[in-house]
Structure formats: structure tokens, C-alpha cells
Amino acid sequence: MIPLKLSGVTRILCLGAHSDDIEIGCGGTVLGLIESSDRIEFYWMVLSSNPERAKEAELSARAFLRRARTKTIVVKSFRDGFLPYIGTPVKECFEELKKAFVPDVIFTPSRHDLHQDHRFVCELTWNTFRNHLILEYEIPKYDGDLRSPNFFVPLSEAICRSKVNKLMRYFGSQRNKQWFSEDLFHGFMRLRGVEASSPTCYAEAFHCRKMLLDCHR
């Protein structure tokens, strides 16, 4: 594997359809980026919630971004499961976001995710941000829609533990779900670590469909 450092990144946009999407998909990467740099500004947006899930999303986002230099956390209240079917106000939300924040890197769900909300958020991400590095994260679930990612971020064991501990602590509404468990989250990062030949044994993985390599000084 040839490593690539994102040393010039200072503005990161994290997008999730649901309150725990970002944490599951790229929570370890977020923690690692904050650990490596105190210059990064985060904009964290969750699109759907109810009062219980909104509280979880807010508390979790604050925990993950606690050491970030600057952070903006936005939790919307669109109806879970219906994002593509109420598309106009969601699209308007993205248009407002484009004016409010200009990111260097965007984390968003995968285009191939079979959950309609995840897929729609990805579609709007690409429609709205056309000159940005977009990394599509993975969410393991019943649908069996995981593919072969092509972009990996090695994670230390300590960061993996921190990610999983925060997930289990802040998302009490999900603890009774069969897929929401410590062993799944740890095991998934361990699997991607093997695929990435990660020196730390763990990694998160993403789909990167377009990247511009600047060879000029």
C-alpha cells in the first residue's frame, strides 16, 4: 500500500442520514484526524431524527468532536426512511449547506448502499459538491450491500476502542438491535485492516470514485 497524507485538509464535512451513520461509517477516521491536527474545522450534519434520536446525535457528535478546533453540529428532523420521497426540502437543505460551508473533504454514505436514505444523501452530495474529495463510508447491516472499498484509513487500537465505546454509550436506542454490537464494529474494522495491510491491524474503508493528484509544486 502507498500511503497518502491529507496534510492540507482543514475543513471537513460529515453527512449522515441517521443519527449514528457518521460515527459508524467514519467515526474512527474523524478521531484520528483530530488527533493528528488541531487545525481542522468540522461541519457535522444529520438529516433525519426524532426527539430521542436527535438528543443521541447531538451528544455523540459533541463527544467525537470534543477536541476539534472548530465544529458546527446540525441535526435536522426529516422523517426517517422517507428522505427520497420528501426530496425537495432535503435538496433545499443541501443548497443552504453549500453556501454555509466549503469543505476540503466530505464523508457521506455509499452510492451502493441499499438503504434509500443513505443512497439519497450520497446522490445529493455528488449533485451539490462537484469540486471536492468525496469519501463514501460503509455501514454494515441486514441488506448485505457491502462491496470492495478502494480507500483505507489505518486506525490505532485505542481509537477503535474509543469509537466503539462512544457508539455503545450514546446510542441507547439502538442497543437492542442485532447488528449494533461491539464485536461487529471491532470485527469490521479488523477485516478492513487485513485488506489494507494496516500496520495497526485496524482500518476504516471508503469508496473514492474521483481523486485529483496534483503533481505541481
Description of each model-found segment:
Residues M1-S19, E23-K141, R147, R169, ...:
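Active-site beta-strand->loop->alpha-helix modules in alpha/beta enzyme cores, enriched
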Residues R53, S156-I159:
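Hydrophobic/aromatic residues within well-ordered alpha-helical segments
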Residues D143-E157:
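Phosphate-binding/catalytic loops
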Residues A158-L184:
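A charged, well-structured terminal subsegment
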Residues F206-H207:
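Short, solvent-exposed loop/turn segments enriched in Ser/Thr/Gly
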